[in-house]
Amino acid sequence: MSESSTPNVKYSRVLLKVSGEALMGEKGFGCDVEVLDKLSHDLKEVYDFGIQLCLVVGGGNIFRGASSSSPFGFERASNDYIGMLATMMNALSLQNALEKINVQSRVLSAIPITAVCETYIRRRAIRHLEKGRVVICAAGVGNPFFTTDTAAALRGIEMGCDAIFKGTQVDGVYSADPKKTVDAVRYDRISYRDLLSLDLKIMDVAAVSLAREHSVPIIVFNLGKRGSFADIIRGRGLYTTICN
């Protein structure tokens, strides 16, 4: 691909956090095939820029550990482990969607499940990136009480990513939920400190604190819009940058 076709691409390695909810579309549960197809093509567009791409997937479309304790009566740790297995299902689905369109990828799990994927090892993950493979990280950080947002921050930092991209259902960070508050204000840029002090729950405190400590910017955008990831990578469209 020529340089003229990829203007303003300033990243060499990025991490995208994909929530489980983003994969279910309008179904209400599980993975929507059309959503997987759209997302895989959006990822391929960025991949074709020559950018090394790693993903962290959530599992909320199948099981939400933190919010499932009350109806199921399970202890929180057990809920979280079930949620980690849900992320594995999503990761394998996304891997297959990518490889259908000839994008080589590897699933690496924080919990050893060697019959279906590799165990996450930092140097192995980086080597896959260097070989031109998309790395899909599953099972969060491998421990209960940590969200997949925190896993995204951790993996992004330890793999030396230039930025962490958080795909949501809105085009950035707002002062309030724009779907409920008409006069909610969208931020083009906001500091980690202000995000935390205003209690804007776009990511959990641990994830934001990790990114802040290591000065890795978090970029929040609407993942549901076709081609939005590639646009944001090129500095186009609407998004919010969280930084110092």
Swiss-Prot record:
Homohexamer. Catalyzes the reversible phosphorylation of UMP to UDP. UMP binds at residues 59, 80, 141-148. This is Uridylate kinase. HAMAP family: PyrH_B (MF_01220_B). It comes from the Bacteria. Its EC number is 2.7.4.22. Keywords: Allosteric enzyme, ATP-binding, Cytoplasm, Kinase, Nucleotide-binding, Pyrimidine biosynthesis, Transferase. Residues 25-30 are annotated as: Involved in allosteric activation by GTP. Signal peptide: none annotated. One of its GO terms (biological process) is 'de novo' CTP biosynthetic process. Allosterically activated by GTP. Inhibited by UTP. The gene is pyrH. NCBIfam families: pyrH_bact. One of its GO terms (cellular component) is cytosol. Pathway: Pyrimidine metabolism; CTP biosynthesis via de novo pathway; UDP from UMP (UMPK route): step 1/1. The keyword Aminoacyl-tRNA synthetase does not apply. It comes from Ehrlichia canis (strain Jake). GO terms for molecular function: ATP binding; UMP kinase activity. Belongs to the UMP kinase family.
